Amino acid sequence: MRVKICGITQPEQGRAIANLGANTLGFICVAQSPRYVTPNQIREIIEQLPPLVDKIGVFVNAPATEIINIVAQTGLTGVQLHGDETPEMCQQLKISLPDVEIIRALRIKSSQSLREVALYFDSVNTLLLDAYHPHLFGGTGATIDWEILAQFKSPIPWLLAGGLKPDNLVSALSQLSPHGIDLSSGVERAPGDKDLDKVAELFQQLHRWKSNFKEKLMEN
């Protein structure tokens, strides 16, 4: 399973989180965010990471030219669009950055907003479904309504986000079947300051879920 830890701000924490098992790290490229990191900071962190770890830059309503420039400066392997980006803009980036993963993050408020997800199936590589907040775009700690997602099917990979933390992870994965999970505030002491004990606990819970899942498969 893909495990993305978002809001990395410190090189030593990024390296430690990758060593604990995270295969994807996220960097906030939004200046107004308390988790914001500059392109230079992102590059410094990336230089200390294992090569197989995916490095995702998170943007909110940034111009395509800015995104392309930051990817070139930093070595990001993916771009996550967390604002009001249209399918057309996503497609434009996909063409401009053919070797870069394009992730569209969508805040799910209702069944209707979930139906709108289909508009992006052809224009991105991956989807990320997050909790809705009227004023904030992500990292809120709010939990998405899992019942809305119960019947969700996607032809492309999707990540579950929205208020995930070690103590509710097993419950979420028992109800849903995402290709991966995304956590930020659920493994933090403060915005941008990751709690490595919580990250370790997260992987313990994930191992527990995998063991239970295998047991159920064998029973059937």
Swiss-Prot record:
UniProt xrefs under Gene3D superfamilies: Aldolase class I (3.20.20.70)
EC number: 5.3.1.24
Reactions catalysed: N-(5-phospho-beta-D-ribosyl)anthranilate = 1-(2-carboxyphenylamino)-1-deoxy-D-ribulose 5-phosphate
One of the GO biological process terms: L-tryptophan biosynthetic process
Similarity field: Belongs to the TrpF family.
Signal peptide interval: none
Species in which this protein is naturally found: Gloeothece citriformis (strain PCC 7424)
GO molecular function, one term: phosphoribosylanthranilate isomerase activity
Pfam families: PRAI
Pathway the protein takes part in: Amino-acid biosynthesis; L-tryptophan biosynthesis; L-tryptophan from chorismate: step 3/5
InterPro entries per UniProt: Aldolase_TIM, PRAI_dom, RibuloseP-bd_barrel, TrpF_fam
NCBIfam families assigned to the protein according to its UniProt record, in alphabetical order: PRK01222.1-4
Disulfide bonds: none
SUPFAM superfamilies linked to this entry: Ribulose-phoshate binding barrel
EC category name: isomerase
Identification of the protein by name: N-(5'-phosphoribosyl)anthranilate isomerase
Alphabetical keyword list: Amino-acid biosynthesis, Aromatic amino acid biosynthesis, Isomerase, Tryptophan biosynthesis
